[in-house]
Amino acid sequence: MDSSHQSNYKLSKTEKKFLRKQIKARHTLLRHEGIETVSYATQSLVVANGGLGNGVSRNQLLPVLEKCGLVDALLMPPNKPYSFARYKTTEESKRAYVTLNGKEVVDDLGQKIILYLNFVEKAQWKELRPQALPPGLMVVEEIISSEEEKMLLESVDWTEDTDNQNSQKSLKHRRVKHFGYEFHYENNNVDKDKPLPGGLPDICDSFLEKWLREGYIKHKPDQMTINQYEPGQGIPAHIDTHSAFEDEIVSLSLGSEIVMDFKHPDGTAVPVMLPRRSLLVMTGESRYLWTHGITCRKFDTVQASENHKSGIITSDVGDLTLSKRGLRTSFTFRKVRQTPCNCSYPLVCDSQRKETPPSFPESDEEASRLEQEYVHQVYEEIAGHFSSTRHTPWPHIVEFLKALPSGSIVADIGCGNGKYLGVNKELYMVGCDRSQNLVDICRERQFQAFVCDALAVPVRSGSCDACISIAVIHHFATAERRVAALQEIVRLLRPGGKALIYVWAMEQEYNKQKSKYLKGNRNSQGKKEEMNSDTSVQRSLVEQMPDMGSRDSASSVPRINDSQEGGCNSRQVSNSKLPIHVNRTSFYSQDMLVPWHLKGNPDKGKPVEPFGPIGSQDPSPVFHRYYHVFREGELEALCRTVSDVRILQSYYDQGNWCVILQKA
C-alpha cells in the first residue's frame, strides 16, 4: 500500500503492520546504506529483502519481477539484503510496487522472506573491484579429466582407522588427511624432523610430474593435505608460514567449485572462483603477502553469465547470482623448506622477524599476561609521546558530557592523559587508568585521577551518574574479559545512569567513506590511532534493532556468536600467532598487534624493536599494542549480555563503533 494514500481511509490492522515494515525498510536502507527512496513513481525500485545477502538468487527474483513487466536491469550487489530493479516503463514499475509489496518468497534455504519495495530515482550501484588476480596467482581450468577426478576421489579412504592422528583428523570446519608431513593448524607449520611414513600417495606422481614439466611448480612437493568441505564449511583467512614451505603452493579442487577470498594488507579484497577440476597456483606476492580463506556459507556469489567460469568475481552487479555449494575436496601440495625464508615481505615473514609475536590467548591467565605485556607495559613506555598526540576532544563525546546535568558525578574509565576530564566544568569528573605515567600527566594538569584496572575499579557501586570508556575495551584479549569490563562500568552507574563506550571498528571504510585513520598522515601516531582527528562524522544505526528471528527486515545486526555458526569462528585457529597490523591500512584480522613508533629520546632505557624487519632503517623504537577490533553489531551484542542495562543509541564515528547505555 502506498503510504501517501493512508489518509484516504482507515487502515486495517494488517495494512498498518505492513506500512510500518515498509517504512522501517526505507529508513534502514537510508541509515545503513545511504539509499534514499522517493515518494513518487519512477522506473526504478529498490527491493528490500530481495538480495544475494538474503539468500535470494537472480534466478528466483527475476521471474517474480517479470510478472509485472519488462525488467531492463536487475542489479544485485554482493552480500547485500536488497537489489535494484529498473522497468521499461513507469507503469510497469508501479504495477510491481502494488503487486509485489509484501509478497512472500522462499529463498534457496527454504525460508520465507517478505519483499518490501520502494521507488528510487535511479537503479545504480558502483563498487570498484580489482580486475586482475593478485600478483603470482594463477587458476588453471580443467587441469585433470572427469575420469581422473573420480579416480582421485575414490582413492581417499575417510573410513580408515583414525587412531593414527598424524595422518587423519576431523576438524571443526572440515575433514583432513596429511601425507609426507603433518600440517599443524595451531601454527600453520610442519615438524620437519617428523615425516609421516609412506610419503605422498603414488596416485599423485603422474600429476605432479606433469605440472613440473608444464612449469606450474618448480619443486616436487613432499607434503600434501586433503581437505573435505561440506556446504557451509570453510577455513579462516591465513598466510601459510613462510619458513615452512617453498614459494609455490598449489591446490586441486575436486567435486565442486568454490569461491576463495584473497585479501591484501591494504584492505584490497579479491574473490576468486575456483572451478571444479581446476588448479590454484600461489607464488610470490599472492603466496607470501595476501591472506586466503574460504568463508563459511552454503552459497557463493558468482557471475551469472555462462562464459565466466574462473578467476575474479567482478563487481558487475547486473551479472551476479548465487551458486549452491556442493561437497568439495581439495588436494593441497607443498614443498617443505629446509632454509630460512628470504622473501621480499619481511613484515609478514617469520624468518625475518627478530622475535615471534605472541599467540592468541587460550585462557584468562594467558589473556591477562598478554594485556600486561602488550597493553599495560607499552603505555607506560610511550605515555609521554602518546600524551603529546592526544589534545582535541571528539565532538560527539563532548556532546555527551555537556548534555549531562550540572553536578553529575562522572567516571572516565581509561582516561589516558585526561583529555575529557576538563570538557565540562559543571561536572565532577574523576579518571582512572592502568598506566601510572598517564595518571601522573593527569595530575600535572590538575585533574583528579588514580591508577586501577578497568576490571576492578575501587569506586562504590551505583555512585556515578555517568561513565565514559573511550577506546579501552578493545584492549581486552577475550570476549569474557570485554564483557567483564562492561559489567564493571554498569556496576558503577546509579539506576538511570548513562555510559558512553567507544571501540575500534573492523570496518574502517563505512558507507563508502574511509575513516580518518585510513586517510590520515602515515607518519602520525596516537594511542588509539583510530581516534586522531579533530572532526568526526556520525552514522546513526537503527536504534530499535530488527528481530533476529525474522527474515522480514531490510537488514540485520549480528549477535555476538553469529560468526561462529556453521563451525566457523571469527578468531583464527587457536594458538596461531597474532598478526602484526600495517598502520593506516584496513584490518584483515579482528585480533592483532598494532605498531607504535616512539618518537624522540625516551628516558627509560633503550627498548629493543620487537618484531621489526631485518635491516630496518627506522631508528625509532617500535612497540606493539594488542587490539581486538569490533565488527558491526558486535558491541551491541556484547552489551546485551549484561543485565540491567539497555542500549539507548548506537552509531559509527570515524572508524569506531559507539553505544550509549542506560542502567535500569
From Swiss-Prot:
Listed cofactors: Fe(2+)
Binding-site positions, Zn(2+): 242, 341, 343, 349
UniProt domain RRM: residue ranges: 43-120
GO-annotated cellular components: cytosol; nucleus
Intrachain S-S bonds: none
Subunit-level organization: Interacts with TRMT112.
Function summary: Catalyzes the methylation of 5-carboxymethyl uridine to 5-methylcarboxymethyl uridine at the wobble position of the anticodon loop in tRNA via its methyltransferase domain. Catalyzes the last step in the formation of 5-methylcarboxymethyl uridine at the wobble position of the anticodon loop in target tRNA. Has a preference for tRNA(Arg) and tRNA(Glu), and does not bind tRNA(Lys).
Name of the featured protein: tRNA (carboxymethyluridine(34)-5-O)-methyltransferase ALKBH8
Source organism of this protein record: Macaca fascicularis (Crab-eating macaque)
